Amino acid sequence: MGHNVLAISDRDIISRNKSINDFDGKKTLQKTIIDTYGNFKADCIILGHADSVDSETLYKLKNLNKNLRVTQWFLDPLGKYGPDYIKNNERINKHGNLLDSTFVTTDPDSITKKINNSFYIPNPSDQSFEILKNYESDCENDLFFAMSHGVHRGSLKKGKFDNRELFINKLMKKNRNIKFDVYGMNNVQPVWGDNFLKKISNSSMGLNLSRGKPIKYYSSDRIAQLFGNGLLTFIDEKISFNDFIPENCFINYNNINDLSYKLNKYQKDKVERNKISKSGQKFYLKFLNSTLVADFILSKTFDYKSKNTFVWDK
């Protein structure tokens, strides 16, 4: 978009600056942010799960520049019946009126505790990351599914259980003719990075199943990888993605029996499966990409009318 962007990793700064005088490294973080702003003179500060940034720091920055805009994006689930409901709501509301806008991957109207000036954003795709075209390959496996016990947690956590395991195990039991490729459960470790890309390249279809009860528009960022790499993507209809993604781009299902029927249907119908997969990838990369999401964030934060169309902005 032509903007000059300076990224600061709060976690890296904290990790490198723990000492007797700064036990958790957070004092150094606040000073680094303020000093950096003094040199960089940003027009906008965008927070992304930066839980260690103090409200007092933002207050000081806004006093330095009355025109400074501060916004945040938040990708974790916010549904009342989802994981970490209380914790996530405390995190997202931490800075209160110091924020000019908030962007979430859940429909704001479906969140129990309303967030001022909040907007929905989809999990963005990026053609530099989503590079596969699985619909052009004869994939070894039918259905890919991956989960973990935490963001980028490298291995399974002992004693940790996820309700999705029950659903997936039941689905596999009902469909023994479907070749599943499943990670993050049943003693199979999660996959990340380049290894994830290698594994996902071997499946023609993917199941987008997030933690907790389905809530309107919420999905983990896995959805961008499924669509973006050309897998036929299956999504619970209660998520309501058909509000802005055409029905010829993915497959809705309403329960495990419906999902089983459709898995078998598209396992057999390669032509239709590949047609939908290709349409889904084309749509997601064109209309739900990182450039458009970035423009949307800035247009709402600075209140300007963009020349772009945002299909998710109803």
What are the language-model segments listed below?
Residues 1-20, 24-28, 32, 40, ...:
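Nucleotide-sugar donor-binding catalytic core of glycosyltransferases
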Residues 249-256, 266-270:
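Conserved acidic donor-binding segment of nucleotide-sugar-dependent glycosyltransferases
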Residues 1-77, 81, 252, 293-299, ...:
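N-terminal pre-catalytic "stem/leader" segment of glycosyltransferase-like enzymes
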Residues 37, 61-62, 96, 200, ...:
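Short hydrophobic patches on amphipathic alpha-helices
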Residues 71-86, 94, 102-103:
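Glycine-rich beta-alpha loop elements in corrinoid/cobalamin-binding modules
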Residues 243-250, 254, 261:
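Acidic, glycine-centered active-site loop in nucleotide-sugar glycosyltransferases
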Residues 261-314:
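C-terminal amphipathic helix plus adjacent low-complexity
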